[in-house]
């Protein structure tokens, strides 16, 4: 919702196309700079599991989009820029951790069809995008952060119930 409908939402909030492009670019660049440090931290034996890190990132993302929705009419351009930019950064930070969670689960011998999962994710994105388009056309662009809240809660529930255990033996063996 946040990336696919960034222009729709931000144009309605008074941003120019140039500002929207810069905001999304900066959000993605900040994420790209932070990803190696977070990945390095996640690989340490004493670090929380990828699942726990995803839950934490998702909670931060949820707070950001709730703040965005709650201040939709009252906030300044600066506040909207910071909230939307941070939301984009968090969203982009979570993607490699989702992939890592799947790959580590497979490596641990659990049955997981990654291709089917990716395909289902694409179909779900298409349906969610279509539905959000209909909602936005009917109720306005303020539906976008509300939809993002709903998707974040759904993602939080899915990750919370994902059966993952951090493989500390592998991490300790790599340390030696």
Tell where the protein language model's regions lie, with residue ranges.
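Helix-loop boundary and gating motifs at the non-cytosolic
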Residues: 1-32
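Glycine-rich segments within core transmembrane alpha-helices of 12-TM secondary carriers
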Residues: 30-32, 112-133
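Helix-to-loop junctions at the C-terminal end of transmembrane segments
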Residues: 33-48, 136-137
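Structural signature of the two symmetry-related core transmembrane helices
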Residues: 51-67, 149
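Hydrophobic core of transmembrane alpha-helices in multi-pass small-molecule transporters
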Residues: 64-67, 71, 75-97, 101
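Paired intracellular helix-loop junctions of major facilitator superfamily
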Residues: 102-113
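Flexible cytoplasmic inter-helical loops of multi-pass small-molecule transporters
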Residues: 109, 160-176
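Symmetry-related core transmembrane helices of the 12-TM Major Facilitator Superfamily/SLC fold
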Residues: 144-161
């Amino acid at each position: 919702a946040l990336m696919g409908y960034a222009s729709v939402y931000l144009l309605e909030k008074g941003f120019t196309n140039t500002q929207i492009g810069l905001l999304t670019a900066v959000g993605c660049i900040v994420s790209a700079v932070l990803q190696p440090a977070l990945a390095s931290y996640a690989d340490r034996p004493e670090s929380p599991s990828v699942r726990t890190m995803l839950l934490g990132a998702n909670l931060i993302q949820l707070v950001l989009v709730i703040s965005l929705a709650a201040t939709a009419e009252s906030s300044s351009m600066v506040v909207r820029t910071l909230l939307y930019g941070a939301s984009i950064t968090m969203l982009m930070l979570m993607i490699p951790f989702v992939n890592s969670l799947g790959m580590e689960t497979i490596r641990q011998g659990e049955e997981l069809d990654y291709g089917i999962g990716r395909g289902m994710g694409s179909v779900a994105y298409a349906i969610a995008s279509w539905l959000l388009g209909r909602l936005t056309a009917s109720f306005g662009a303020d539906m976008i952060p509300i939809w993002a809240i709903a998707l974040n809660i759904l993602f939080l529930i899915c990750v919370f119930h994902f059966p993952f255990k951090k493989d500390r033996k592998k991490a300790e063996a790599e340390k030696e």
